């Protein structure tokens, strides 16, 4: 996986690299699908750890497959998400395809959540529905401090 890959940043309305969005160090990348239970569960699962993720200070880049998916997402349904989230879309699904191929995933189900660093080392991956994902991510980032 390459942190130099581009995505479309929904706030700035520009293409940028994951590295430019996250700065050096570790980050969370979540390749998500709107209005799907596994993605909804993931978002609800990280909300209780909002303060911990904000204290960690690293970015969480959440990417939809394309603009139409981003438009269907109801952000207002998810209160109390960390302010370190960068919302975007995956340009030509480059990021998803690289993670899918390089991590040898066998199912194209979203969400796919990774914790990686800007030297392209993935230290955590989860795909699909996973109970306690917020806690798992919190445990991983605490070990990285």
Which residue stretches match the model-derived regions?
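Thiol-/selenol-based redox modules, centered on thioredoxin-like
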Residues: 108-145
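A short beta-strand-turn-helix
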Residues: 1-27, 34, 44-48
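Hydrophobic beta-strand anchors of alpha/beta hydrolase catalytic cores
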Residues: 28-29, 113
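Extracellular/periplasmic catalytic domains that process cell-envelope and extracellular macromolecules
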Residues: 20-23, 54-55, 79-81, 105-108
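Active-site-proximal beta-strand/loop segments in catalytic clefts of secreted hydrolases
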Residues: 31-34, 63-66, 90-91, 117, ...
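Short acidic-hydrophobic, aromatic-tinged amphipathic segments that line or gate anion-handling sites
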Residues: 9-11, 84-95, 126
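Structural micro-motif
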Residues: 82-86, 102-114
